[in-house]
Each structure stands twice: as structure tokens, then as C-alpha cells.
């Protein structure tokens, strides 16, 4: 077998699994400390088509946790697209209004790595739950061993997840999907962040997405 950048992914999932990854269309909402790491892992794993949506540019304060943030002033989604040809960048603010007008049906997996609650609720209601994965709060924490994956209704401790569940119920949502969250109590009031946690959130999202694509039990 000829070695290439995806040789070890082929070894892991076999040619059939790798073919599914190459054919997959994934949407990642958010290119910050969580979403950026998720996208990087997906691209390195051979996902053939990734649409990445985020409005922001890289700021110096991103450099404690966000990959490729050395390019201060660069548009986040475009910086990722320069590195990975499989990425289609969309520099857009994700709002409930944007979600209402966007076609999610063409994607095999949709990943929510944004912070805005209203937009998160709109996403959850717009996407087929079997294709949806979401991140809860990764800031204010330092212990990656406290990160968990569970059904959205089974989260605990995380204040963002608590509010998210409340707003989901209020919106009339009754579906079920997996989320990544932490059972570590927040250790500060400002949005302090540590790459050891935010990166692990993103990698957990990528793992869930890859398993959905290749058909492994999640």
C-alpha cells in the first residue's frame, strides 16, 4: 500500500470507512477554540467536504487556545480554507434569521460549536437530530478529564447546558442528540479559557462526527 497523509485513517477504518469519510459533507458552525480544533481533526481525518461558518477575525486574545490564530487580523474561516482545500469558508454571523434561511439538508453531520443561545436553539430546531452534535460550555475550566458526552437531556453541572435545556423545552423541541459538556464547576466569572479543555471539546465533537459518518455505534 502506498503511504499518503490518510494511510493511518485507512488502517483504522478500512477502505469502506475511509470512502465514507471522503464522501461526507459536514457543516461546522463556529471556528473558535472548540470549532477550530474540531475542523482541523475532521480535515486531517479525510472528510471530503467541510463547510465552516464564522463571522470573526483572529484577535491576539485568541492565541492562548485557537489554532492558526498567529494570523492576527485574518478572517478565521478563510485562514482554515488556505490550509485545507476541503473547507468551504462562509464568513457569516450565525443568527436565528440566518438559520431560518439556510439549507441544512445536504449535510451528513451538522456541528454546533457556537456560544449564542438563541442561535444554538434555532440550529437544534432546524437540523435533523440524527445528524446533529452540539458543544456546551468549554470556558472557565481547566480539567479535560471532566469532559463528557451524553444525550442533551442528561447533562449536568454546566450552567450553559442548563439554560440550553430550558430554552429547548420552551421552544417545543422534543428530539434527542448528543452534546459535549463538562461536569467541572466553572472556576471564574469572566470567560477565561484553557486550550487543554477547549481543544478536547473540539476533538470530542470530531470523534462523534467521524463515528456517525463511518457508521460506528455512538
Task: Please describe what each predicted stretch is.
Residues 52-83:
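Glycine-rich phosphate-binding loop and adjoining beta1-alpha1-beta2 segment
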Residues 1-26:
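N-terminal charged helix/coil linker that caps or initiates catalytic domains
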Amino acid at each position: 500500500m502506498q503511504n499518503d497523509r490518510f494511510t493511518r485513517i485507512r488502517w483504522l477504518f478500512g477502505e469502506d470507512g475511509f470512502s465514507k469519510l471522503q464522501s461526507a459533507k459536514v457543516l461546522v458552525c463556529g471556528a473558535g477554540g472548540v470549532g477550530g480544533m474540531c475542523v482541523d481533526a475532521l480535515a486531517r481525518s479525510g472528510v471530503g467536504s467541510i463547510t465552516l461558518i464564522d463571522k470573526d477575525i483572529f484577535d491576539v486574545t485568541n492565541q492562548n487556545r485557537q489554532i492558526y490564530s498567529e494570523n492576527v487580523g485574518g478572517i478565521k474561516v478563510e485562514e482554515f480554507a488556505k490550509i485545507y482545500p476541503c473547507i468551504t469558508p462562509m464568513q457569516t454571523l450565525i443568527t436565528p434569521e440566518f438559520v431560518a434561511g439556510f439549507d441544512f439538508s445536504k449535510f451528513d453531520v451538522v456541528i454546533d460549536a457556537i456560544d449564542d443561545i438563541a442561535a444554538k436553539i434555532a440550529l437544534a430546531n432546524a437540523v435533523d437530530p440524527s445528524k446533529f452534535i452540539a458543544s456546551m460550555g468549554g470556558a472557565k475550566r481547566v480539567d479535560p478529564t471532566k469532559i463528557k458526552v451524553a444525550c442533551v437531556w442528561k447533562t449536568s453541572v454546566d450552567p450553559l447546558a442548563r439554560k440550553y435545556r430550558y430554552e429547548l423545552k420552551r421552544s417545543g423541541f422534543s428530539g434527542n442528540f448528543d452534546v459535549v459538556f463538562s461536569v467541572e464547576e466553572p472556576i471564574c466569572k469572566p470567560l477565561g479559557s484553557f486550550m487543554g479543555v477547549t481543544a478536547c471539546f473540539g476533538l470530542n465533537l470530531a470523534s462523534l462526527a467521524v463515528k456517525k459518518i463511518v457508521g460506528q455505534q455512538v
